[in-house]
Amino acid sequence: MRISIIFHSVCANNYLVAKTFYESFKKRGQSVSLFRVADPDWIEQKDVPLAAKENLKNMMGLPMATPEVMLESDLIIMGSPTYFGNVSAEMKAYMDLSAKYWVKAQLAGKKIAAFTSAGNPQGGGDLCLQEIHTFGMYMGMLCMPVPTTLIPGENIHPFGIIYYSYSKYGEKLDPKTQTAIEKFSEHLIR
């Protein structure tokens, strides 16, 4: 199975989620690649913690995603920051670039899963995940929900993984999010 993780990140929060997915698939012996979407307006943040600066630097060294990446993938993990209950403009632009594949349903049958970061539980992260799944459905892709049994006793949104940053820059993920990513990765390759 060829897995591509395609994400947009400004503060390195989504980069951390994407990287954790990447590492989880790698340790399970999967063929996985990590891509960031183009962000021509991105500027280096000055007043951020040192760990976040290092993560942002590493993120900027990743290859850019092209729509062709999706054609070459069996499973696509797509992630975007949540902006007003939606994906970022940069992720939407990336999605729109793939419109050429819609006419002939060239992405039909491929699996898609979603993740996002949001400032807090009221930040609209669920709506952002829904937008990624809506994109997948229009492209004929198979949307992969999070099973209710992923982590017994925990409430994980069925549309994907949400990392709540509480306005922090991408320094490290909380243990609950890390566990959810590990378990969801394992579920996706069954």
Regions found by a protein language model. Give the residues of each.
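Short, glycine-/small-residue-rich phosphate/pyrophosphate-handling segment
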Residues: 108-154
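N-terminal beta1-alpha1-beta2 submodule of the flavodoxin-like/Rossmannoid cofactor-binding fold
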Residues: 1-104, 151-190
